[in-house]
Amino acid sequence: MNFTVGFKPLLGDAHNMDNLEKQLICPICLEMFSKPVVILPCQHNLCRKCANDVFQASNPLWQSRGSTTVSSGGRFRCPSCRHEVVLDRHGVYGLQRNLLVENIIDIYKQESSRPLHSKAEQHLMCEEHEDEKINIYCLSCEVPTCSLCKVFGAHKDCEVAPLPTIYKRQKSELSDGIAMLVAGNDRVQAVITQMEEVCQTIEDNSRRQKQLLNQKFETLCAVLEERKGELLQALARVQEEKLQRVRSLIRQYGDHLEASSKLVESAIQSMEEPQMALYLQQAKELINKVGAMSKVELAGRPEPGYESMEQFSVIVEHVAEMLRTIDFQPGASGDEEDDEVTLDGEEGNTGLEEERLDGPEGLH
């Protein structure tokens, strides 16, 4: 579902409300999305309950939450585009919630509950000339005013314009800004989803490498147990460093998304103000906030291959005198398990060089 139009048409228009409602229909239950709303990797949305129904139907042997049996996940196809969705052991509860869509649904329901154009149009009166309506806009001072103020009042030397002209201009400017923010929110949501997948890949790769280490160290004697602990600690340290970095980025992107969504909601509510003068009193500040939010630069994502843990691949050779020199091979690609480890000391050096575990470039 794509909401990048940013509510450019006002929600107060009945035709546009009908069009928006069509975009908020779940393809499974054919009703308006019910919270929580989850977003699939293909960027389509479903009620979490509906997603769970489809998932359970596609995976009849999968154990639901609360079961004592540990499940390995499952898969199902998106009902909108048929893209295959692969889930982890958490099932549909591991899918990201689409808070933006949930906020839009709340706003839509609020708008639908009240009659259109319920507020009678009123005119603000000039504070200096109580019998004069505010009907022009001072471009120099950037405030609404009345005709008498222009003729012989405080704004007689200022440049002015008709109130409706400035009203339409600034409303269009704010609407365009909202569209940019909503489009940016979609991109941020996609980035968050991708980085969560990176976290999962890091954990999967780390788990695989730990299993390989354990399998190979089981064949060695007690002296290997000490070294195995050292290597596992190094792997876990780098894993934690990587996960902390990616999770920190996820929190940063999430905070930006939340702030941007709140600003979008505030701007949309401001656009619903039917009084031009009241609207213009707060429009400039909102426009500035929207512009500033649109220019916020987020921290870069992890570089390609950041999730790889292949540098921790090892292979065990039965050379007892070199056991204590086993170390992770710097820059190991992990393509062939037979090349996963090097034995320091082949030239006669059998000393334990533990300082290489503290900070080799291949581990960072």
Swiss-Prot record:
Basic and acidic residues compositional bias: what residue ranges?
A: 353-364
A Pfam family name for this chain? zf-RING_UBOX
GO terms classed as biological process: cell differentiation; innate immune response; negative regulation of microtubule depolymerization
Which InterPro entries does the record cross-reference, listed alphabetically? Answer: COS_domain, TRIM/RBCC, Trim54_Bbox2_Zfn, TRIM54_RING-HC, Znf-RING_euk, Znf_B-box, Znf_RING, Znf_RING/FYVE/PHD
Q: Which UniProt keywords apply?
A: Coiled coil, Cytoplasm, Cytoskeleton, Developmental protein, Differentiation, Metal-binding, Microtubule, Zinc, Zinc-finger
Q: Identify the stretch(es) annotated as Mediates microtubule-binding and homooligomerization.
A: 168-211
Positions that bind Zn(2+) = C126, H129, C149, H155
Zinc finger map (B box-type): 121-163
* Assembly and oligomerization: Homooligomer and heterooligomer. Interacts with TRIM63 and probably with TRIM55. Interacts with tubulin.
Q: What is this protein called?
A: Tripartite motif-containing protein 54
Q: Which organism is it from?
A: Rattus norvegicus (Rat)
